[in-house]
Structures are given as structure tokens and as C-alpha cells.
Amino acid sequence: MAPITVGDVVPDGTISFFDENDQLQTVSVHSIAAGKKVILFGVPGAFTPTCSMSHVPGFIGKAEELKSKGIDEIICFSVNDPFVMKAWGKTYPENKHVKFVADGSGEYTHLLGLELDLKDKGLGIRSRRFALLLDNLKVTVANVESGGEFTVSSAEDILKAL
């Protein structure tokens, strides 16, 4: 499947997360992104070094600025189960705006065309690192990394595009 790109409508599919009442929710992407400006940023794995020390902290640190520029939701996405994503989210006590969601089976990652084969590293099929800006489901920015790089998908890169 070809990777998602600018101008595409983000595919519908399901993601899972724990809500503020600690209840597991499985929802369609369209239900949380329709009519909104949403940043969906993907990482290869929870608790991995670049994701934990650079990518996620960047979005947490810039969340207020992103929201001031009209962003309604900031969603961190990974091919992990929702329990792992919940635990990972708790490692950022300063976080007030980034929602940690799971694509447990990797099906949504496949719909996006953003799979990354990390079997040689013992991680299986994961998500490429990326940052998408969605405006009422339409992709207006698609910053997708090659391999395990972290050069175009930061919060700063999204801010520059706003």
C-alpha cells in the first residue's frame, strides 16, 4: 500500500486508548478527527530511546503553542497495546495535551501505508516515525521519516508548517 500523502483523506480504522476515567476505549479515527485539526504522530515503539527522549517530549513541550495555532488534538500513535501506551504516557507527568493511542494489531498502520519492518531488531512490524496534520480528515502535512530517522517529524516541523 502506498504511504499516505498530502491531499489524502485519512483512512478510517480503529485505535485504542485509556480515557481519563481509566476505561479502555476503542474508537474510529474518523470519530475523533472529523471536523477538527489534529496532529497524529507515529513512533516505532513505546519506551524506545528516540521516541521517549526526543519525539514525544517535543510534542508535549510544544503542545500549548500548537493549540494556540488552532490544533484541537495531539495524538501519539504506536503499534503497541493500549496497556503499554497507558504506562508510557504516565512517564510524562507534565503532559496535559498529548493522547497516547495504540494500534495493537498494526492494522491502522497498514491502512496508512506506514509499516516499518523491524523484525531484525526483534520488534516485528511497527509504524514508521511520522507526523501528519489533519484538517477535517484531510492530510495537509505528511512528514514521514525514512527508516529509523528523526529529521522531519518533530513538533517544530509541524509548527513551521502551520
UniProtKB/Swiss-Prot annotation:
In this chain the Thioredoxin domain maps to: 4-162
Q: In which tissues is it expressed?
A: Highly expressed in buds and flowers. Slightly expressed in green tissues. Also detected in pollen.
Q: What class of enzyme is it?
A: oxidoreductase
Inducing factors: Highly induced by salt or oxidative stresses.
UniProt-listed PROSITE patterns: THIOREDOXIN_2
Give the location in the cell: Cytoplasm
State which Enzyme Commission number(s) the record gives: 1.11.1.25
Active-site residues are: C51
Q: Which GO terms describe its cellular component?
A: cytoplasm
Q: Which GO terms describe its biological process?
A: cellular response to oxidative stress
Q: Which InterPro entries match?
A: PRX5-like (IPR037944), Redoxin (IPR013740), Thioredoxin-like_sf (IPR036249), Thioredoxin_domain (IPR013766)
Q: Which GO terms describe its molecular function?
A: thioredoxin peroxidase activity
Q: Which SUPFAM superfamilies match?
A: Thioredoxin-like (SSF52833)
Keywords for this protein: Antioxidant, Cytoplasm, Oxidoreductase, Peroxidase, Redox-active center
Quaternary form? Monomer.
Which family does the similarity line name?
Answer: Belongs to the peroxiredoxin family. Prx5 subfamily.
Q: What else is known?
A: The active site is a conserved redox-active cysteine residue, the peroxidatic cysteine (C(P)), which makes the nucleophilic attack on the peroxide substrate. The peroxide oxidizes the C(P)-SH to cysteine sulfenic acid (C(P)-SOH), which then reacts with another cysteine residue, the resolving cysteine (C(R)), to form a disulfide bridge. The disulfide is subsequently reduced by an appropriate electron donor to complete the catalytic cycle. In this 1-Cys peroxiredoxin, no C(R) is present and C(P) instead forms a disulfide with a cysteine from another protein or with a small thiol molecule.
This protein is called Peroxiredoxin-2C
Name its species. Answer: Arabidopsis thaliana (Mouse-ear cress)
Its encoding gene is what? PRXIIC
